[in-house]
């Protein structure tokens, strides 16, 4: 009986994890950002890899990430940046020697949302299950 119960619990966890991935992501920006939407995945990747540092109006882009252990960040890294966490860490190590720092990290989707609401020029990502209140949705990632 115990192995069967364990199998059922494991299946439920996998289904829930899969549904979180299936939700997709919203790429959100501070309401002050004036940019043609939707942004392409290439543009978003360039922002997060610090290849684009300013918005079209000349204001600074301030990208914000989830913590490295977040499922939302894993989905973003694999889907948008097309890298795994190890490759991305190696990329940031290289840029560190050029004096560049990775994006700011927030511990929850609500914290990302609050950061983007309050920091001019900021851009972040949240799952589609979070209401994007007070921000501009600049792209949707399936």
Provide a role label for each language-model segment.
Residues 23-142:
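Exported/periplasmic ABC-transporter solute-binding proteins
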Residues 9-10, 20:
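Cleavable N-terminal signal peptides
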Residues 16-22:
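Sec/Tat signal peptide C-region and signal peptidase I cleavage site
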Residues 1-8:
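Bacterial N-terminal signal peptides that target proteins for export
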